[in-house]
């Protein structure tokens, strides 16, 4: 689940809390556990000390170690909004007419944010991802000692790069050593410093 509203639905399978339900502290974890969420995603804004405190209280946690963080869901298509058409409905054919959904949204400062289209019954929803990927491999030894499950999220990596990243993070879990090259533009998150 990525939205608290999803927790009100009856689920025939165990529910894991995704990035949208990220956990900052024990009180938040206890709240979701009371709603039968069996696995929780820790906030990417927690530092090493805060993570240790959270993990000490028990629970089943996963940490996003690699990938582009989803920043938002867009209910209004940037292409249609730019043209002044703010309606969003299933009759829209802009993507089909113009060769598909734009894959990149470039902001006024030149940052490039990948978009992924979800076609829904009522129209489209676009996932907007961070302009840089998170790659915590440079903290491999620290991640290993945290003894937490790691989530790897792929958006635009080639199958070869995906295999390389998966194998590398297996090394992080097993021995505290990452084997892949880290993109110079990647962010390593807040593990050492926290939010300033």
What are these regions (language model features)?
Residues 1-31, 35-196:
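Active-site pocket-lining/capping segments in soluble small-molecule metabolic enzymes
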